[in-house]
Amino acid sequence: MQELVATCVLLLNAGHEASVNAFGNGMVAALKRPEQIALLRENPRGVTDTALEEFMRFDAPLHLFERTATVDTEVGGVKIEKGQKIAALIGSANRDATVFENPDEMDLTRDPNPHIGFGAGIHFCLGAPLARLEMSVSLPALWEKYPTMALASEPIRRPTFVLRGYESVAISV
């Protein structure tokens, strides 16, 4: 029973942390781009699914993961020995021009969007379904209630490198 409770707490925390930071990062980025905000104002429910995936791609809450090589390998011409640790830069992968058209631009209608903001494979975020659910409910609800929402001042980022998010975001409604 104790393991079950611990697993539930892990899932809730993983989903909550991912959704809070993805939502905050994505909303700030969108609020700074009038053409993207216009899409949300006009039809928040119509762009919710693609918008939340773009939030994860454009400014994911986690940009850096440490990984350990399980076999000797080579990546981009660099030899990596079994047991060696590497830093996987998710933020960089989500801006790969060979995968994404106009990768440095936010596009809330981007589809397909094969981002790895939630990780991939065996390292896929356990909280991803909860994060997607929370964002898919809150995004249209927020825009329907506050359609004139705008940034009131420059948001303040948390002073961390790995888990990206904001300490405060002041908005006007």
Segments and roles (model prediction):
Residues 1-173:
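Cytochrome P450
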